[in-house]
Amino acid sequence: MAVPKFKKSRANTRARRSQWKADNVELQTQKINGQEVQIPRRLVKAAQLGLIDLD
């Protein structure tokens, strides 16, 4: 397991952690069962197969 050789300052630790941000998911417009819905790309196939509820 990797172990740090030197102590990191609080400022450096927080600056490093601040780079970890969640990204916005891009929505795609799909026509499913005659209605247009905006869903994430990774859920398009599941929506077409009826595995998820789109109400």
Swiss-Prot record:
Annotated keywords: Ribonucleoprotein, Ribosomal protein
One Gene Ontology term from the biological process aspect of the record: translation
Region: Disordered, residue numbers: 1-22
Pfam family, one: Ribosomal_L32p
GO molecular function: structural constituent of ribosome
GO cellular component terms, A-Z: large ribosomal subunit
Compositional bias ranges of the Basic residues kind: 1-19
InterPro entries reported for this sequence: Ribosomal_bL32, Ribosomal_zn-bd
Record family assignment: Belongs to the bacterial ribosomal protein bL32 family.
NCBIfam families noted in UniProt: rpmF_bact
Protein's name in the database: Large ribosomal subunit protein bL32
